[in-house]
Amino acid sequence: MEKLTGKRLFMLTFGIMMSLVVFGQQVRVSGTVTDAADRQTLPGVNVVVRGTLTGTITGANGEYSLMAAPGDVLVFTFIGYLPQEVTVGESNVINVAMRTDVQALDEVVVIGYGTVKKSDATGSVAAVSSKDFNKGAITSPQDLLVGKSAGVVITTAGGAPGSGATIRVRGGSSLNASNDPLIIIDGVPIDNNNVAGSSNILSFVNPNDIETFTVLKDASATAIYGSRASNGVILITTKKGSAGSPLKVSYDGNVSVANAIAFVDVFSGDEIRQLALERSDFFGIDNLNLLGLENTNWQKEIFRTAISHDHNLSLSGAVKTLPYRFSVGYTDQNGILKNTDMQRITGSLSLNPTFFNDALKVNLNVKGMNTHHNYGDQGAIGSAVNMDPTQRIFDGNPASDGYFLWANYGANLGTPNPVVQAIEVDNSSIVNRLIGNIQFDYALPFLPELRANLNLATDISNSEGHNNRPSTTSPNLTDPFYGVIYNYNATNKNNLLDFYLNYNKDFEGINSKIDVTAGYSWQHFEREEDNLREGTVGEEHPKYQPPRPGG
């Protein structure tokens, strides 16, 4: 038995020593990544030690630094460039010149009211296709693009289910006006103003339906859209059916679990009581009498383990000369804050027939969404940090539905019970949205290089919701109008007509090309909103109290 123990001890010691030797061989490798053609530095290049999770990205000057051992292989990857691998040798400095992916330059990208090859694009254009999207349980289209395009910063607005994001292309341009980019989906410019009750302007698009993002960053690329594109343009193209393709059925589903991984460090009930006793001369005897006997962790009481699931089904193919794609999706996302969730149903239909020997191309796109949001009360998070941990959640007082409230103990002002805020506040909405367009692209028979394009689109959103707060959630305990009833409904409409002519001809004899576009665009926005707000008196509970006439 002693020999076996000694052998195990020897093997453990040997393993530790070998680990130290291997670790000691690692050195800091640094360098600069440039473009092989013009020697310009490349920021945002991914540098990874092959076969490991060790990696970094190049900074604004194309510089990188990471730990690696001699013999390790560094893999350099960047969108639009060929991957490159370099083996770490004796030198600690490895500079890399990356070559452009010629095949990528031949790809067609959407720009303005047309498409061009990447090699012909004169402005700053970045295209991100579905194979480069972020992976995982993604329910918002913006999350697909995070970190995938240089100069595009996407910041999630919050952790609530279905929350939107702030998008900036090459930073902000104004202190007072909007800095949001113009977003165009399948040729339809989207209104950046959400309908009441919605928190994400892109929530109607199922992330699984998106084929590419194209980001137009500079003035030459965005000029055709006018001043509304001063903050950049993001073009979203959804998936389509292919001519001659057989029926293809695809299903994608996932289940995710979320937890609050950290809390604000606050005093426990015991620590509060000890501090109060030590400073009783400061707090006063009356305040000490209000201390409870509990050790309530209010933050843990308002958070939960949230289980969410997402399901997507699509059918694509072609019926003779009619390519089609149909998809439906269902998302049930629960928030880690109690009483917050989102249920969303999305549907899309795409038909892309051609006529007259492909001279006339028709694109029909229809997308619909129904979303039910429970927003809860975000104020419960702040109350949970500030609430007295010596108090219990329930004290049995029928005047407050059994919950502990400072009002029951004669206080005039106090932190609301965070559990009441999280559970009793009824802040929910139902949002419906329908967006569709039909586009005709016709090559004139007498001049094939000249194409006429007509795009007709409509975007309609409507919502109804309420934010009803019972009297038990008010911090002001002397005003008789404790509770609030707030009901609203809203409608946003957006109609579009685009018509333009495009002449595109190659003069191979002189190695030149002409591309001219002229057109007319009309867009009309209409918004309506009605709301009713009133206070409730005494013990009325607005969650169950209908609005009174004249309130």
Task: Give, region by region, the residue ranges found by the protein language model.
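Surface-exposed loop/interface segments of Gram-negative outer-membrane beta-barrel transport/assembly proteins
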Residues: 243-294, 336-340, 346-435, 453-551
